[in-house]
C-alpha cells in the first residue's frame, strides 16, 4: 500500500494528493499532526534518507526558530528530537511504497518516474 506522509494543509501535499488521485493510485495519507510520528518511524526515515534531507530548512517553521535552536541541530539525534517535537519541520511529502526507496518531495516528473517503475 502506498503511504503519503505529511501535513494536510501543506500546498505541496495537496499537489501530491491531487496527482495520486488523478492517476488512480490508491494511497493512505498519514498526517503527522493527526496520526502522530513515533520514533521508530522517524528513525526509518532518517536511516534511509538522512536527517539533513528530512529537515526542511527552507520552510517557515525553520525560519521561525531562534538561531540558538537552529545551531543545536548538528546530528541525527538532535534533528530527530526537533522533528518529533515539531513535525511541520519535516520536508514533505514523503512517499513510501513497500520494497521501493522512499521518495521525498513532489514533482510531476518524479512521481511519474516513481510509479512507472512500480
UniProtKB/Swiss-Prot annotation:
Domain of life where this protein originates: Bacteria
InterPro entries named among the record's database cross-references: Arsenate_reductase-like, Thioredoxin-like_sf, Tscrpt_reg_Spx/MgsR
Cellular component annotations (GO), alphabetically ordered: cytosol
Gene3D superfamilies given in the database record: Glutaredoxin (3.40.30.10)
Enzyme active site: 10
TM spans (from-to): none
CDD domains: ArsC_Yffb
Family designation: Belongs to the ArsC family.
NCBIfam families: arsC_related, PRK10853.1
Name used for this protein in its record: Protein YffB
Organism: Escherichia coli (strain K12)
Lineage of producing organism: Bacteria, Pseudomonadati, Pseudomonadota, Gammaproteobacteria, Enterobacterales
Amino acid at each position: 500500500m502506498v503511504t503519503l506522509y505529511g501535513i494536510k494543509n501543506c500546498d505541496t501535499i495537496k499537489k501530491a494528493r491531487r496527482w495520486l488521485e488523478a492517476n488512480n493510485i490508491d494511497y493512505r495519507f498519514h498526517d503527522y499532526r493527526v496520526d502522530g510520528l513515533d520514533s521508530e518511524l522517524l528513525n526509518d526515515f532518517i536511516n534511509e534518507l538522512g536527517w539533513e534531507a528530512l529537515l526542511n530548512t527552507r520552510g517557515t517553521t525553520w525560519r521561525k526558530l531562534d538561531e540558538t535552536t537552529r545551531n543545536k541541530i548538528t546530528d541525527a539525534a538532535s534533528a530527530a528530537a526537533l522533528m518529533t517535537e515539531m513535525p511541520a519541520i519535516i520536508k514533505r511529502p514523503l512517499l513510501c511504497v513497500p520494497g521501493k526507496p522512499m521518495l521525498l518531495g513532489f514533482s510531476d516528473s518524479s512521481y511519474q518516474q516513481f510509479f512507472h517503475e512500480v
